[in-house]
């Protein structure tokens, strides 16, 4: 399946629009990762534990989006947008939402 942030796919004609599809993931950040990120914040640098959590959540959201596109008979998703939001009282949950337009291309 082709997935792209652009509104068209070069060299491909859109034959049918199937509608908007979404993939959502809410991921909790555990205490160990939170402590490691605190040290990184204090000493400077990148938090590999949070980055890994973010990457995994994004990949899962895109996979869910593709599965939903397949379910409506699409073979591509165009105009993909990915949004991130921190949730929970302590900001210990991450929501990743991927959205796009499911289409059938030639």
From Swiss-Prot:
Domain of life: Bacteria
InterPro entries according to UniProt: UPF0145_dom_sf, UPF0145_YbjQ-like
Gene3D superfamilies: Hypothetical protein apc22750. Chain B
One Pfam family recorded for the sequence: YbjQ_1
Signal peptide: none
Family affiliation: Belongs to the UPF0145 family.
HAMAP family: UPF0145 (MF_00338)
PANTHER family per record: UPF0145 PROTEIN YBJQ
Protein's UniProt name: UPF0145 protein CKL_2433
Naturally occurring in which organism (per UniProt): Clostridium kluyveri (strain ATCC 8527 / DSM 555 / NBRC 12016 / NCIMB 10680 / K1)
Biological classification of the source: Bacteria, Bacillati, Bacillota, Clostridia, Eubacteriales
